[in-house]
Curated annotation (Swiss-Prot):
This is Probable cytosol aminopeptidase. Its EC number is 3.4.11.1, 3.4.11.10. One of its GO terms (cellular component) is cytoplasm. Pfam families: Peptidase_M17, Peptidase_M17_N. It comes from Cupriavidus metallidurans (strain ATCC 43123 / DSM 2839 / NBRC 102507 / CH34) (Ralstonia metallidurans). One of its GO terms (biological process) is proteolysis. It is an enzyme of class 3 (hydrolase). Gene3D superfamilies: Leucine Aminopeptidase, subunit E, domain 1 (3.40.220.10), Zn peptidases (3.40.630.10). The active site is at K294, R368.
Amino acid sequence: MEFSTKALDLSKAGQNGFLATKTDCLVVGLFEGQSLAGVAKALDVATKGLVARLVKQGDFEGKRGTQLMLHEVAGVGAARVLLVGLGKEADFNDKAFAEAVRTATRALGGTRAASALWCLVQQPPQQRDVAWAIITTITLVREAGYRLLERHPELKRAPRGAGANEKASLRKIVLAVDVGDAKAASQAAVRGTAIANGMELTRDLGNLPSNICTPTYLANTARGIAKRHKLKVEILGRKQIEALNMGAFLAVTKGSVEPPQFIVLRYDGASAKQAPVVLVGKGITFDTGGISLKPGEGMDEMKYDMCGAASVLGTIQAVAEMGLKQNVIAVVPTCENMPSGIATKPGDVVTSMSGQTIEILNTDAEGRLILCDALTYVERFKPAAVIDVATLTGACIIALGHVNSGLYARSDALADQLLGAGRKAMDTAWRLPLDDDYQDQLKSNFADMANIGGRPAGSVTAACFLARYTEKYDWAHLDIAGTAWKSGAAKGATGRPVPLLTQFLMDRAA
């Protein structure tokens, strides 16, 4: 879908102004119980009081979540006019704005409209600007229009006659802004499109079946990103991983015939003097649990155990598309976790790249094993900050459900930056404790530590395990087990936390 911006002069709204624009649909927002203003007022004047009459007669009151589609309206160039309720202006917050965007998108999806002049972004919530409104609009509209089978048609044979009676899909949206916002709006459209592209890549990688999206597939995806955006890429295979003494990572790979990959993708957007932000993504392309085998029911969803990897690849692609003035490195350890005659067994002791030994009490706590070696590896970059992203624990889902990602950080400053970015991007996280007292649960009689700490505070002890490998830099951990994908009728990857991560990086580059 193509997005562009157009500056409006409300003083020229009539026959020769923006309302004369030829388009399939004009989208206009109305507040509940307010006098008409802005575009709504201009539309009312051009249509000789039509909008005011609709409000007065009770046909459309501007209530939140409502819409009214009008056809062949005299005085405008659009084939349709869509009125969207914004609710009461005093209550118009981020969620109300998002609801208006989703309401308009659904309404347009029920028509044959292929283009729209979208006049909602001039009315951002308080504390937000037009750039925020544009980025939010683009990501939400693209999110609603995402279909894996359209992006990967090889996965399903089209039925006979497919497409003969299908409605035209929305292909072009022009986002109308005030003249004074034109420059900021243009940059925001580029950024919103980049974030949406990154989210779609992340969703694709998560949704693809594990016989397609293998560690090698992820490595080739990274190569493709590097080629398209002129990034530096390095892919390490098993022999190189062995040479680095990544014993924890290698322990997870033992049961699978799929070769492990260690991906390093580098975007140099700023001076070489700027220390990079490093994003580390867990890339378990299928997780059976290994010898500590998971129950069969729902195991198909373990293809989503690489969503951390998918999200850091989506994020660095978005950053490159934006041309952000920030150095960013994406690091992805990726493999399968499978049972076999040579797989790692409960009770085995391995030596990580850091030299610390680990008693593997549960082979289904494998994400932290591949991450700990990656977190040791990234010390060489002398990073400004490291953020690891992982579908790490079911315990995080029990704690936070499917609304907030779990956030752990030693530094209050880094935690606050990530939490603020999440709120702004409507991709929220909740900070959980990282107290040293929890470390006692990881004690082992046979190694420096165990890889699990028992049932209590399972997400916390997983983060505490990772913390032992991050003492040389500023670090945060995002547990996205509850937010990376949805189950049920709407099953599929969400693209989170790409919005949070990209907003965090945009804020740092500002």
